[in-house]
Amino acid sequence: MKQVTGGVCAAQGFSAAGIHCGIRKNQAKRDLALIYSAVPASAAAVYTTNLVKGAPLTVTKAHLADGKAQAIVCNSGNANTCNADGIAVAEEMSALTASALHIAPQDVIVASTGVIGQPLDLTPIRTGLPQLAAALGDHSDQAAEGIMTTDTQPKEIAVQFTAGGKTCTIGGIAKGSGMIHPNLATMLVFLTTDCAISAPMLHAALTGDVSDTFNMVSVDGDTSTNDMVAVLANGLAGNAEITAPGADFTAFCRALNSVTVWLCRRIAGDGEGATRLIECCVTGAEDHATAKTVAKSIVCSSLVKAAMFGADANWGRVLCAIGYSGTHVDVHKVDVFFRSAAGTVCVCTHGAGVPFSEEEAKQILLEKEIEILVDLNAGDEGATAWGCDLTYDYVKINGDYRT
């Protein structure tokens, strides 16, 4: 497996584009994105667990009932959520996309991200979609920009792997900076692959992966109304279709995971106002569920996040987060380390503090990427969660989001 350029356009048969059509006031910001497969593709998606769901999710879920799709359209600047006409608007957005691409409306995945509760005016989208379709090409970067809201940078990646003796590619773009606490900010992830895989196996791979990747990311503890992870697989790599578990399915899942973990880290590191990426690795758990819960509890802790912003090795906050995680952990067995490119420091052994250099710890925590290592010393299971520090800028960004 190797990383390649091209994002969602790296796989055979995929093209993309992103333009400014007028949804957002800032003309320098792209606000409409399109991903297109030259042939119909197997498709799967997972969605937010928030009971308040954006209209695009409802429409997309209906469209994917047959496990097929050929395009993904997404606007930024408006979530099309909690609107009386939201379903009709999302359906028309699908129809407009289908008309521009000469495909069926039910083969369009539709997504939106932005402000909740404001009507989505389709006028700029009606004008923009023909232009967007005409601009399709090797423009994954433009599509990545078109789905951004408070993100500071686009997020795209692609990798190549082998399945059935054929070289296959999987790529992805993502947005997410705030309201990131998925159980599947708004967090949107769009993946493309030329690997031939059936819709049921594609769905199995995606749901299995999301549980340990995107559902383990938290920026601010808020679960968005519009979270979606969607994948298209058009089969143009020419491998024998994956229809059951086996070596090829394992290879596909590993490639998928390499893409999703990379995107998880970029989403967490680009949290609103963030200055540091936090990766919490929990080992020594008696079961996987416990490891996941503990890791997520730590990265969700506002006090831990604030301590990381201040480069303060306040390990007691880590123990506190473990204690209220709801798991049955013997805190008297817990070891805690902080690690970064500047080194590693042990701050807690068997649930009690140990002498360490505060200055050394501070230098470790001043790095842009920080690891919180927790050993529960109770078993062989582990899990990883991602988050970011909590800064003054987070409040500033969200205090005037609508203005």
Language model features with spans:
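A structural signal for small-residue-enriched, beta-sheet-centric alpha/beta enzyme cores
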Residues: 1-88, 92, 98-403
